[in-house]
Amino acid sequence: MEMAKEQELILVLDFGSQYNQLITRRIREMGVYSELHDHEISIEEIKRMNPKGIILSGGPNSVYEEGSFTIDPEIYNLGIPVLGICYGMQLTTKLLGGKVERANEREYGKATINAKSDELFFGLPSEQTVWMSHSDKVIEIPEGFEVIADSPSTNYAAIEDKKRRIYGVQFHPEVRHTEYGNDLLRNFVRRVCNCTGEWTMENFIEIEIEKIRQQVGNRKVLCAMSGGVDSSVVAVLLHKAIGDQLTCIFVDHGLLRKGEGDMVMEQFGEGFDMNIIRVNAQERFMSKLKGVSDPERKRKIIGNEFVYVFDDEAAKLTDVDFLAQGTLYTDVIESGTKTAQTIKSHHNVGGLPEDMEFELIEPINTLFKDEVRALGIELGIPEHLVWRQPFPGPGLGIRVLGEITEDKLEIVRESDAILREVIREEGLERDIWQYFTVLPGIQSVGVMGDYRTYDHTVGIRAVTSIDGMTSDFARIDWEVLQKISSRIVNEVDHVNRVVYDITSKPPSTIEWE
């Protein structure tokens, strides 16, 4: 991952903490660029990156376990400020000559510390609530260090070597439970590391455009466009950088939401004057999906067919050297560090063929999802597009449970459009993480007018979440739910019942398939 030399950087080294991405995000929220890297990064690479500061993350291991994660101690001699968090503090203590031992019992939860007003705690009250999560404890600090915070359970809640600008805290400042955690991190970034905080989406665009132009030159780029936020932002950024050297392929597999295909062509083809090839492949996809009910088989068929269609269209183009992808920083982190854990595979449409001889361009692979949205706004993409609902690669194919037919797709498409319209009218778009309708394949008896019906049931799924890893069902007002239900039953053919999913994640997932 190349990075402009003039850009201030805080380097976060990963020791397996569940909060490691949070550290990176907190730093970026301060206007300072931050990257998460494996703890085994070389001294030479650190020197090349030239960070203003280094943060050692927490982790689940003991520093005394066989094979426990460590770093090259030369890091402490680079003259770069270092902050160790939990495991990072214990490792620092051990490597610099202090003593660490296994605690009698793991300390987990809120604790109260008493802090001195030094650089790290500058401007903060002496007594504050923090979040502890550790099984080792420091019993003797290295030479040159002093205690800057203690607690009822430990004499060494925070330590510092002011001369070498090396710090350690036995709690997690990056989590919300730590009362002044953001302030502590800001003190480290601004006061200790002397960062100015000038990283913005505006200068990110300037830097990325220059990088794209240098990489591409006068050659051509191909972009697979789904109409989703990530690929749309990538396409607009590339178009801003290289104009007509970019060609986008938009595969319409017939599993899109109502009006989505036309919207992509109108907003991006006409609105941004981009060269987009729309491939109408509905019949091709539906013929492959005929008679298939198993969700994994459906997903695989849709993914494979997308690849084949894209490959066929790409083969018609000549002199294309680059392929652009909307890879996010979360994808890079999960695939790039030894401590990464894969929680759940995403609904990607599938990898592109290995024999496609393109160089990759991934201009947003240093950004988190919320940063991509901010980038989209800065690029001039309308807010209603930037804040569109997340949509899985297989599209409505996994929101029709069981076999997919045109009639079933129409029910989901129309009911989902009604749901989104009412949510928008009620001003709830930003309050609900994700919302959509599903067709669970259940028919039930109903009465419409003077006639008995035996028609489909539509399910509504709406959840609140911070990151999508866990979620709770949204507490939508009953009157709003009644409005949604009434409109669906009255406006969508062959539906006589609407149900609301009130299950959290876990145990269920957000999507039904």
UniProtKB/Swiss-Prot annotation:
Enzyme Commission numbers on file: 6.3.5.2
Catalysed reactions listed for this entry: XMP + L-glutamine + ATP + H2O = GMP + L-glutamate + AMP + diphosphate + 2 H(+)
Binding site for ATP: S226, G227, G228, V229, D230, S231, S232
Active-site feature positions: C86, H172, E174
Gene Ontology annotations for the cellular component aspect, listed alphabetically: cytosol
InterPro entries for the chain: Class_I_gatase-like (IPR029062), GATASE (IPR017926), GMP_synth_C (IPR001674), GMP_synth_GATase (IPR004739), GMP_synthase (IPR022955), GMPS_ATP_PPase_dom (IPR025777), Rossmann-like_a/b/a_fold (IPR014729)
Annotated ranges, domain Glutamine amidotransferase type-1: 9-198
Claim: Signal is one of the keywords in the record: no
MF (Gene Ontology): ATP binding; GMP synthase activity
Domain GMPS ATP-PPase residues, every copy: 199-388
Keywords: ATP-binding, Glutamine amidotransferase, GMP biosynthesis, Ligase, Nucleotide-binding, Purine biosynthesis
Pathway the protein takes part in: Purine metabolism; GMP biosynthesis; GMP from XMP (L-Gln route): step 1/1
Entry-linked HAMAP family: GMP_synthase
Known role: Catalyzes the synthesis of GMP from XMP.
Subunit composition and interactions: Homodimer.
NCBIfam families cross-referenced by the UniProt entry: guaA_Cterm, guaA_Nterm, PRK00074.1
Name of protein: GMP synthase [glutamine-hydrolyzing]
Lineage: Bacteria, Bacillati, Bacillota, Bacilli, Bacillales
Gene that specifies this protein: guaA
